From Swiss-Prot:
It comes from Plasmodium falciparum (isolate 3D7). It comes from the Eukaryota. This is Sporozoite surface protein P36. Glycans are attached at residues 98, 118, 206, 298, 374. Involved in sporozoite infection of hepatocytes and replication therein. Keywords: Cell membrane, Disulfide bond, Glycoprotein, Malaria, Membrane, Repeat, Signal. It is found in: Cell surface; Cell membrane. Residues 1-33 form the signal peptide.
């Protein structure tokens, strides 16, 4: 009887206390949630540059969103001028506008330069990259008489305008004929008295892919010779519509459609040397293009006499590397003269002979680069 009385007493008090306890825990949970919301809002505002910076790395690297969340949770307190991620080197002069970066040449290193967008200056173009001569009056001496393509034939430069900055991609050529140092500059603010912000790249010929000084195997329908040559087969589409390349595992092959000597002419304007497009030459990007789009990321395979299939090269060679990379964002059209240069690094493991092609589209026809990749010979 006593047990029933105590049980009824406890149950009656429990029903009275339960709403109070529930409201107390709910209040505590809401208080903590509000504090966490305020903290992360403040944290995001303070660390937004770092988050955007690493987001660009993920987008450039084509590695998806997972590294972004790992970085955000793990090392989001890191705020750097230079960063090495795998074979990517990033120089952040957007947030370090009065400083410089220095890196050594590596043909397998993809270099990314982040520059601020200064509305008072002209837009970024390849004239901001040139042979390094020296510094005078805290300014980098710009040797505009020598375009970067004369200094390093086969270099690829591109630009994406994202997140209120220039995202300049620099792909160094696999063939380098001599030791040299180049710089790519960013514009500093008008009232800045600091040195011009720049990225310096030290290039050593003995670090190039072909250390014997040989050109890269490939088809150059731009017929670039002399100081502009970087591929083995230089030819004109009017004379040769087919270029055949035999390559082995571990080698690099290339393709190009533009003649760089014809693309630019030098004129004197106000006693200053400037480069401009020669309106009378044949290098019109509306009609001269490398196909399929994003060759060598995509290549063409002939399935039969009348059937051609385009597929990703990694379906044929899973470990192959192609340069430049493929982006879902539109590229700056001022860099289109580099858009017909492409490289493919063949992996060491090639299970069987593979035949594919890319081609240059000209007003008068096509120039086809046919690439025969030999299978790996078992030892």
């Amino acid at each position: 009887m006593a047990y029933n009385i105590w049980e009824e007493y406890i149950m009656a008090n429990f029903h009275n206390v339960y709403p109070v306890v529930t409201n107390l825990f709910l209040f505590i949970a809401l208080s903590y949630s509000f504090c966490i919301f305020v903290f992360f809002s403040f944290f995001f505002v303070k660390m937004r540059k770092v988050i955007y910076f690493f987001l660009i790395i993920c987008l450039h690297s084509n590695v998806g969103w997972h590294p972004f969340f790992v970085f955000f949770c793990g090392v989001s307190g890191l705020y750097v001028k230079e960063l090495q991620v795998g074979n990517y080197y990033i120089c952040n002069l957007k947030d370090y506008a009065n400083e410089t970066c220095t890196v050594n040449y590596d043909y397998n290193k993809m270099i990314k330069l982040l520059c601020p967008i200064n509305k008072s200056y002209e837009e970024y173009d390849d004239r901001y990259c040139f042979k390094f001569i020296g510094i005078r009056d805290r300014l980098v001496i710009n040797n505009q008489e020598e375009p970067i393509m004369d200094t390093l034939p086969g270099i690829i430069i591109e630009n994406l305008n994202m997140f209120d900055r220039y995202n300049v991609g620099i792909y160094m050529p696999f063939y380098v004929k001599e030791d040299i140092t180049i710089v790519c500059t960013c514009e500093s603010s008008k009232d800045s008295e600091a040195i011009t912000p720049y990225l310096k790249i030290h290039v050593k010929a003995n670090n190039s892919f072909n250390k014997e000084g040989e050109f890269i195997k490939g088809c150059d329908y731009g017929n670039n010779k002399g100081k502009h040559q970087f591929l083995t087969n230089t030819l004109k589409q009017e004379e040769n519509f087919l270029c055949e390349i035999n390559a082995n595992p571990g080698e690099v092959v290339g393709m190009n459609c533009i003649n760089f000597e014809e693309y630019t002419t030098t004129t004197t304007i106000n006693n200053k040397k400037k480069k401009h497009q020669n309106k009378n030459n044949k290098n019109n990007f509306d009609v001269i293009q490398l196909r399929p789009p994003h060759c060598f990321s995509n290549v063409s395979i002939s399935m039969s006499f009348l059937r051609v299939v385009t597929m990703n090269v990694n379906n044929l060679l899973p470990e192959a590397k192609y340069y430049p990379e493929v982006y879902s964002f539109p590229k700056d059209k001022k860099f289109q003269k580099y858009s017909t240069i492409s490289y493919l690094w063949i992996p060491e493991n090639v299970p069987h002979d593979i035949l594919f092609y890319c081609h240059c589209n000209f007003p008068q026809g096509k120039g086809i680069g046919l690439f025969n990749i030999n299978k790996t010979v078992e030892s």
